[in-house]
Regions:
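C-terminal helical cap(s) of enzyme catalytic domains, especially alpha/beta-barrels
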Residues: 1-3, 101, 114-137
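Conserved anion-binding
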Residues: 1-54, 58-63, 68-74, 81-86
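Short, low-complexity, polar/charged sequence segments that are solvent-exposed and flexible
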Residues: 32-37, 74-75, 94-97, 128-130
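Glycine-rich loops and low-complexity Gly/Arg-rich segments
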Residues: 37-42, 80-81, 99-103, 132-135
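Generic hydrophobic/aromatic pocket-lining and core-packing "Φ" positions
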Residues: 44, 62, 97-98, 124
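Conserved, mostly hydrophobic/aromatic
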Residues: 47, 65, 100, 111, ...
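N-terminal amphipathic alpha-helix/helix-capping segment at the start of soluble metabolic enzymes
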Residues: 62-70, 88, 95, 129-132, ...
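Glycine-rich phosphate-binding active-site loops on the catalytic face of alpha/beta enzymes
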Residues: 82-83, 90-123
Length: 137
């Protein structure tokens, strides 16, 4: 991270904190003696100190990231799942589009809800409509 941060130029460098497919039980299995939020914050602090611009983190931890690190940390949130059709998949720490932005995400990453939709275009357009409604002035 430090080498990337030092040589990044105009490129934004992001670092993964904790995968959205992991929860506290998984961290215990991996030997981490802390909760998810503590690990996310610890890794985010290290990422910023190494020159990264932001982190990839569940929207569940975004409020803590913004609360502790402020606007200097860019938060990119994967694991976006629609409220009306939240599937049971391998993602354990998910939020919907509105929750992600309300919690402080700067950007979202949406994969399966679009890719696996019966009508991917309609799914993408519905997400765009939600985002437009959140940010309309």
């Amino acid at each position: 991270m430090e080498a990337a941060g030092a040589e990044k130029g105009d490129v934004k460098i992001l670092a993964v904190t904790v995968l959205t497919s992991l929860d506290r039980a998984d961290l215990d299995d991996l030997g981490f003696a802390c909760d998810v939020q503590q690990l996310v914050l610890s890794r985010a602090r290290r990422c910023l100190a190494a020159g990264c611009d932001g982190v990839i983190s569940s929207g569940l931890e975004a409020p803590a990231l913004k609360g502790e690190l402020g606007e200097r940390v860019m938060v990119v949130t994967p694991g976006i799942r629609p409220v009306e059709n939240r599937p049971a998949d391998d993602q354990k720490r998910t939020v919907d589009v509105a929750q992600a932005f309300a919690n402080g995400a700067d950007y979202i990453v949406v994969g399966r809800p679009i890719r696996q939709a019966v009508d991917p275009r309609a799914a993408a357009e519905a997400i765009q409509t939600t985002i437009a409604g959140i940010f309309k002035t």
